[in-house]
Amino acid sequence: MPTEAHVGDLDGSASSQGGTWKATVTVTVHTSSHSPVAGATVTGSWSIGGTASCTSDSSGRCAVATSAISGGTRSTTFTVTGLTHATMTYKPAANHDPDGDSNGTSIVVRKP
């Protein structure tokens, strides 16, 4: 049974909402053998201020989102600050992102 978990992907998206916009980041958590991890709580912070957390589902994914961001703000960065699980320990040095849009720990989301 695996004992370590890490972030295996961060994907960002943005949506316009009138004069504001919203950033969403989908986090994928998996084991060293790339099996999805359900029940992991991921915590992080936004560069525009504020924190967010989510709990991974059976596919190892969960999403965090900002509230409305001013139209004058061109981007925000989400940085993973922690990951907890009932039976696994977090190994942040193993964080990665296969598509290269992040380093597995932080991702920039740009205004649409």
Q: Positions of the model-derived regions?
A:
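Short strand-edge motifs at loop-to-beta-strand transitions and within beta-strands
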Residues: 52, 62-64, 105
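Short amphipathic beta-strand segments in non-cytosolic proteins
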Residues: 28, 41-53
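Short, ordered, surface-exposed loop/turn motifs in non-cytosolic proteins
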Residues: 23, 34-46
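Enriched for extracellular/lumenal, surface-exposed ectodomains of secreted and cell-surface proteins
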Residues: 78-98
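Short glycine/proline/serine/threonine-rich loop/turn segments at secondary-structure transition edges
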Residues: 70-77
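Beta-strand-rich domain onsets/edges
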Residues: 1-24, 30-31, 108-112
